Amino acid sequence: MISISDTAQAHFCKLLEKQEPDTNIRVFVVNPGTPSAECGVSYCPPDAVESTDTTLEFNGFDAVVDAESAPFLSEAEIDFVTDQMGSQLTLKAPNAKARKVDDDAPLEERINYMIEAEINPQLASHGGKVMLMEITEKGEAILQFGGGCNGCSMVDVTLKDGIEKQMLAQFSGELTAVKDATEHEAGEHSYY
């Protein structure tokens, strides 16, 4: 479910030494399965463990996960990295915003998952997002851009060199093209 690097495990052990005995960590997702999902790590004293929690054993401590967060922490990775700027704990949870769908799920579900898990997080740095409007009989995914992407002069590059390439590679043989249905109006909301 969750992998924690050796450096992160050592970091947690050091932090937990200063806590009450038998305190562990809790890994959780606030608003799981939504675009506003956020992951976190906190201390988990023994009296805060619920019967429905999952307990994962690591070197020197346990990671406790609540039942609601568990499916959204599938494939999550926690690392502790040090660079010239200092040290930082990172938590990557690719399924926090959208529950991973099965490979045999309908094409529309798999495309929506890809949009929420991979594409929209990239566009969010510019205040943008994209939504799947329909899949045509010809296998074309029709998208609509919103936020900072609406009216952005780089939207064609984003679509052709980014999104379309990713989607056609991921859904080879199922999608033939990716098209934009947005009526772009440049304004203060536009990124470029």
Swiss-Prot record:
> What does this protein's record comment on cofactor binding?
Binds 1 [4Fe-4S] cluster per subunit. The cluster is presumably bound at the interface of two monomers.
The name this protein carries in UniProt is Fe/S biogenesis protein NfuA
What is this protein's function per UniProt?
Involved in iron-sulfur cluster biogenesis. Binds a 4Fe-4S cluster, can transfer this cluster to apoproteins, and thereby intervenes in the maturation of Fe/S proteins. Could also act as a scaffold/chaperone for damaged Fe/S proteins.
Q: What are the annotated disulfide bridges? A: none
Species lineage: Bacteria, Pseudomonadati, Pseudomonadota, Gammaproteobacteria, Alteromonadales
Which is an annotated Pfam family here?
Answer: Fe-S_biosyn
* Cofactors named for this entry: [4Fe-4S] cluster
Q: How does it assemble?
A: Homodimer.
> Per the UniProt entry, what species is this protein from, by scientific name?
Pseudoalteromonas atlantica (strain T6c / ATCC BAA-1087)
Q: Which GO terms describe its molecular function?
A: 4 iron, 4 sulfur cluster binding; iron ion binding
